Structures are given as C-alpha cells and as structure tokens.
Amino acid sequence: MSQVERDHATLQAGKVVYTAKTHTSGGRENGASRSSDGRLDVQLSLPGAVRIGTNPEQLFAAGWSACFESAIGVAARKRRIALPADPAIDAEVDLHLADGGYFLSARLNVSLPGLARDVAQALLDEADQICPYSKASRGNIDVAIKLV
C-alpha cells in the first residue's frame, strides 16, 4: 500500500471532530459568505476594489495562521515547553497567474519571543506536521515557514 493509500485509509477511518459549513453566493467579486452558525458573515470583494469585503486569500491566511498557532501549542505541550504569552504569526498568501491558470503560494512568519531559536524551530517543524492546513497544502503550493 502506498503512502497516499495509507493516508486515505487513515482519513476514512478517522473521527470527524468538526465540520465547518458555509454558504457563499456571488463569488469573490461581489459575493458574501455566511457560516451555518452565523459566527462568520462576510462580504467578498476583489483586492483593491471599491466595495468593502475580504477575499479567499485573506480567509485562507487567517485560517492557516490560527490553525498553525494552535499546532505550535500542541507541540509545546507534548514537549512540556512553556510558550511565550505573545506568540504571533504573520501570514501572507499570494494569488499567482501563470500560463493561463491561477495558483497560490504562502509564507508564515512566526514569532515566539523569549524561546531559544533551536527550541522554537523544533516547535515550528513539529507544528508543520500537526497542522491540517500544512498537511493540505504540502506538495500542492510553495510554502515558507520562517521563525522571525
């Protein structure tokens, strides 16, 4: 069985712990997205448009950085390392157009002030293996995760 087949089998056997549900209409140019529980209710617009709204790249950056910071916490607890009170992640997601197609790239710039650099880097490396967004993007888009 290949690694892909093993991963798929694990996913099929895994317990669903949460399902996010949203309804989107109008697309990225003049749309809106709302979650089924009402906690997310956003207008969508193109970057730089007159209309106020967010876009899929901003939502992806926010989701990934929040998830990655939580994964750092999981890694820290596993290693019994106290995290600083003010960890932060600046996420950048680029939308590219090349050869008639769109694709993404991303950078996560992680700040863990007060931790030794080698300890912080070990946490980032482990978090990258834990975070579902990192797993989903691995091998699909160019990603740089950097300790700043």
Q: What are these regions, as identified by a protein language model?
A:
Residues 1-62, 69-148:
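Extended beta-strand/beta-hairpin segments
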